[in-house]
């Protein structure tokens, strides 16, 4: 009876610990990818994200990038990701993917966030984002909050 309880306790602890392990290996992969990006690469990722968003049908007409620009950006990022996954972070990729096949997707989400953060470091971008406030009726908003 005691040995059955021990086996059950071990199985439960393994089930509880497995997600933590896969999460930490996913975090390690994400951190490795981010840590191995230099400033130029971060800016290139930001440009790539911008081009990708510019493909949206509602905003495509505002996009000034040429198909050649987009292709060059795609090619650059493809080679960058290949380097990150096969050279800089290959061991972490293997560990993370083995414990959680979704780890690669999660790591790419982090890379996307880094690209967006790069865009948001620009004072011009932050000013442009805040421009809507000139047209918001803050008195009406304040009234709702009181």
Model-derived segments and spans:
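Repetitive helical segments and hydrophobic/amphipathic motifs
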Residues: 11-15
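N-terminal signal peptide c-region/cleavage motif recognized by signal peptidases
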Residues: 17-19
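Bacterial N-terminal signal peptides that target proteins for export
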Residues: 1-8
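Terminal, compositionally biased segments
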Residues: 7, 23, 142-146
């Amino acid at each position: 009876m005691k040995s059955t309880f021990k086996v059950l306790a071990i199985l439960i602890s393994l089930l509880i610990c497995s997600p933590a392990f896969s999460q930490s290996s996913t975090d390690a992969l994400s951190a490795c990818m981010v840590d191995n990006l230099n400033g130029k690469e971060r800016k290139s990722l930001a440009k790539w994200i911008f081009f990708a968003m510019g493909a949206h049908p509602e905003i495509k007409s505002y996009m000034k990038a040429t198909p050649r620009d987009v292709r060059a950006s795609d090619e650059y990022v493809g080679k960058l990701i290949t380097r990150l996954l096969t050279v800089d972070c290959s061991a972490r990729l293997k560990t993370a993917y083995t414990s959680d096949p979704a780890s690669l997707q999660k790591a790419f989400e982090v890379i996307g966030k880094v690209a967006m953060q790069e865009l948001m470091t620009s004072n011009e971008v932050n000013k442009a984002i805040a421009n809507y406030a000139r047209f918001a009726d803050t008195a009406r908003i304040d009234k709702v909050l009181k």
